[in-house]
Structures are given as C-alpha cells and as structure tokens.
C-alpha cells in the first residue's frame, strides 16, 4: 500500500511539472495586491472628432512601432470608461500595455460624436461604452465578439481586465 501511495505521489508530481507550464502562459502576470485604483479616476476622452483617415494613420503608426493598436470608444461621463482607464493606468498593467499596445481613446460624447467610426469597423451601433477594439498587425479586430466586454468594468476585478488584454497579445 505504501508503495502505491509513493508511486501516486511521484506520478502526480511529474504531472504537475508537465501540466502547469502548459496551462500557464508567458503572459500570465499577476498584479500585486497593493495596486488599487487612484481617485479621481482619469478623464481619457478629449472631445476630438476623428476621421477614418485619422484612424488608419493611428493603426499604421502603431503597427510600424511593433505595437498592437487598441481603440477604446467611450466618454468621460461613463463610470465604466473611467474605471477601465484607471485600471489600465495601474503600474503593472500600464507597463505591460506600453510594451505591447498603443491606445487611442475616441470620444463618443453622448452617442453623438465619432459614431461613424463604429460603423466603419462594422460594429453594431448599440449603446454601452467602453467599446474596446484590439487589432493584430494586419488591422484585423481580434475581439469582435467581445467589444462590449467592459461596459461592466465597474463589476470586474482588475486582474480580470489585465488577463483579457494579456490574452490578446500577439
């Protein structure tokens, strides 16, 4: 009996050495528990009107810098937009985002500004911001099915938000 237990321990120890590295990604960074949102929350939207040509320049510029472009549609009136941005400004996340991404914040006002750009990307014009678009280096939207994911940012853990962006890095 003792022999079987020892063999089981060896077997599961071996499995843990093999399985854990497979299930953990190199991108899995855990945030330190002392990183918390700072008040007041950021106001990342400046009211600027963008044209399709501005968006194309942003995408090209980001890709030329070997960064993945992110466009975040939102407004400073929206608590979820501000919470998402505050989370992206936490030191661990900010460092990671700067290394991998270039972000453009597009102000939608009260759904009366820059809405043509949402149509430009063939995203349904639904209310709810922030709308986050993450691109690859060929300008394909990687998260088309989850662009509305962070309209509930206030209900999410900071690590969950961080994991989302880590998973989309290419």
Give residue spans per PLM region.
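Bacterial Sec-dependent N-terminal signal peptides
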Residues: 1-28
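N-terminal leader/targeting and pre-domain segments
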Residues: 28-65
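Extracellular/periplasmic catalytic domains that process cell-envelope and extracellular macromolecules
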Residues: 63-64, 95-98, 124-128
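Short active-site neighborhood of thiol/selenol oxidoreductases, capturing the structured segment around
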Residues: 64-78
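Solvent-exposed loop/turn segments at secondary-structure junctions
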Residues: 76-80, 108-113, 139-141, 150-151
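Typically the conserved alpha-helix immediately C-terminal to a functionally engaged Cys/Sec
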Residues: 82-96
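Thiol-based oxidoreductase modules, predominantly thioredoxin-like and allied folds used
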Residues: 97-115
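Non-catalytic, surface beta->alpha helical segment in thiol-disulfide oxidoreductase systems
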Residues: 127-170
